[in-house]
Amino acid sequence: MDSRRKVRSENLYKTYWLYWRLLGVEGDYPFRRLVDFTITSFITILFPVHLILGMYKKPQIQVFRSLHFTSECLFCSYKFFCFRWKLKEIKTIEGLLQDLDSRVESEEERNYFNQNPSRVARMLSKSYLVAAISAIITATVAGLFSTGRNLMYLGWFPYDFQATAAIYWISFSYQAIGSSLLILENLANDSYPPITFCVVSGHVRLLIMRLSRIGHDVKLSSSENTRKLIEGIQDHRKLMKIIRLLRSTLHLSQLGQFLSSGINISITLINILFFAENNFAMLYYAVFFAAMLIELFPSCYYGILMTMEFDKLPYAIFSSNWLKMDKRYNRSLIILMQLTLVPVNIKAGGIVGIDMSAFFATVRMAYSFYTLALSFRV
């Protein structure tokens, strides 16, 4: 069989693990621990702190121009630590997905996975990367074209960054590099949930295909059909284990994602309407606004899609030729039927379901923040 036609979920995560290697968290290369310590200390922790301190006693207009990015950096660091804490579980999920890859039986299943979940997951990965690169470029250009010798964002330094040209450019470079690395961290944070939801949805659909075919091949004996059903039960158990691990992995990180998106969408809208000082700044805020929606929408969409695929499992069970099966098969079928009746959903913080209703609720929350801010406008 052509290896390119095989179902290989691990290939969809190569870019994801590349982000962690670039950040010094994963991989085996010289000075990895030094890279990890440097980025964690001076970027993940100190960069948001220097942004927060930089807003102290500054004019309101300057605070608003930097507030969206300060908030995003703060939540980015929070999500980064949440995901880093759960990397062991993420690797376990990937191992279970590889086990499910090996269960693919027919050309129909391979074609479906490669043309649907695999293609969509690659598109999502590329979309996040394009959005990140666009944000880095527009932020840097907007900073370079701002009037006067100003930094990209309000920030505190233990010296006068305007003292000399060299000191200014060192400070500017720190913000440019720091913001770029935090955007790289955000790629690792935000790309994982929708890609995994998409891959899991694909494997649920493949299980549906396998279950619905049982009993329709006259060449197979009753014992062979029963074995296929038991294998389907084992596949379902692995899928439910993945769901349990995803609940643990995304419990806190996605709650931060919802809060971050709601707050930053509203702040960015205000900046676009009232505080953008030139076309480059307007473009940057517009790209940032789009990035906020891109961060949130795929997770919610593929979260509800995954739930809908699980809801189809009972119908797949009764699509098999169960009426002509023996008692052993039907007993196993009843067991699987009871297992598939368990609701499958993942909630951020155990409160907010990761689905489209949560996406629209977040957008409504952002609009509420926006109207509240307008009411304080003089």
Swiss-Prot record:
<feature type="transmembrane region" description="Helical; Name=6">
    <location>
        <begin position="286"/>
        <end position="306"/>
    </location>
</feature>
<feature type="transmembrane region" description="Helical; Name=3">
    <location>
        <begin position="128"/>
        <end position="148"/>
    </location>
</feature>
<feature type="transmembrane region" description="Helical; Name=2">
    <location>
        <begin position="63"/>
        <end position="83"/>
    </location>
</feature>
<feature type="topological domain" description="Cytoplasmic">
    <location>
        <begin position="84"/>
        <end position="127"/>
    </location>
</feature>
<comment type="function">
    <text>Odorant receptor which mediates acceptance or avoidance behavior, depending on its substrates. The odorant receptor repertoire encodes a large collection of odor stimuli that vary widely in identity, intensity, and duration. May form a complex with Orco to form odorant-sensing units, providing sensitive and prolonged odorant signaling and calcium permeability.</text>
</comment>
<feature type="transmembrane region" description="Helical; Name=1">
    <location>
        <begin position="34"/>
        <end position="54"/>
    </location>
</feature>
<dbReference type="GO" id="GO:0050911">
    <property type="term" value="P:detection of chemical stimulus involved in sensory perception of smell"/>
</dbReference>
<dbReference type="GO" id="GO:0005549">
    <property type="term" value="F:odorant binding"/>
</dbReference>
<feature type="topological domain" description="Cytoplasmic">
    <location>
        <begin position="1"/>
        <end position="33"/>
    </location>
</feature>
<feature type="topological domain" description="Cytoplasmic">
    <location>
        <begin position="307"/>
        <end position="355"/>
    </location>
</feature>
<comment type="subunit">
    <text>Interacts with Orco. Complexes exist early in the endomembrane system in olfactory sensory neurons (OSNs), coupling these complexes to the conserved ciliary trafficking pathway.</text>
</comment>
<feature type="topological domain" description="Cytoplasmic">
    <location>
        <begin position="185"/>
        <end position="254"/>
    </location>
</feature>
<keyword id="KW-0807">Transducer</keyword>
<feature type="transmembrane region" description="Helical; Name=5">
    <location>
        <begin position="255"/>
        <end position="275"/>
    </location>
</feature>
<feature type="topological domain" description="Extracellular">
    <location>
        <begin position="55"/>
        <end position="62"/>
    </location>
</feature>
<keyword id="KW-0675">Receptor</keyword>
<dbReference type="GO" id="GO:0016020">
    <property type="term" value="C:membrane"/>
</dbReference>
<feature type="topological domain" description="Extracellular">
    <location>
        <begin position="276"/>
        <end position="285"/>
    </location>
</feature>
<dbReference type="GO" id="GO:0005886">
    <property type="term" value="C:plasma membrane"/>
</dbReference>
<keyword id="KW-0552">Olfaction</keyword>
<dbReference type="InterPro" id="IPR004117">
    <property type="entry name" value="7tm6_olfct_rcpt"/>
</dbReference>
<keyword id="KW-1133">Transmembrane helix</keyword>
<feature type="topological domain" description="Extracellular">
    <location>
        <begin position="149"/>
        <end position="163"/>
    </location>
</feature>
<keyword id="KW-1003">Cell membrane</keyword>
<keyword id="KW-0716">Sensory transduction</keyword>
<keyword id="KW-0472">Membrane</keyword>
<dbReference type="Pfam" id="PF02949">
    <property type="entry name" value="7tm_6"/>
</dbReference>
<dbReference type="GO" id="GO:0004984">
    <property type="term" value="F:olfactory receptor activity"/>
</dbReference>
<keyword id="KW-0812">Transmembrane</keyword>
<dbReference type="GO" id="GO:0007165">
    <property type="term" value="P:signal transduction"/>
</dbReference>
<feature type="topological domain" description="Extracellular">
    <location>
        <begin position="377"/>
        <end position="378"/>
    </location>
</feature>
<protein>
    <recommendedName>
        <fullName>Odorant receptor 33a</fullName>
    </recommendedName>
</protein>
<dbReference type="GO" id="GO:0007608">
    <property type="term" value="P:sensory perception of smell"/>
</dbReference>
<feature type="transmembrane region" description="Helical; Name=7">
    <location>
        <begin position="356"/>
        <end position="376"/>
    </location>
</feature>
<comment type="similarity">
    <text>Belongs to the insect chemoreceptor superfamily. Heteromeric odorant receptor channel (TC 1.A.69) family. Or2a subfamily.</text>
</comment>
<dbReference type="GO" id="GO:0032590">
    <property type="term" value="C:dendrite membrane"/>
</dbReference>
<feature type="transmembrane region" description="Helical; Name=4">
    <location>
        <begin position="164"/>
        <end position="184"/>
    </location>
</feature>
<dbReference type="GO" id="GO:0170020">
    <property type="term" value="F:ionotropic olfactory receptor activity"/>
</dbReference>
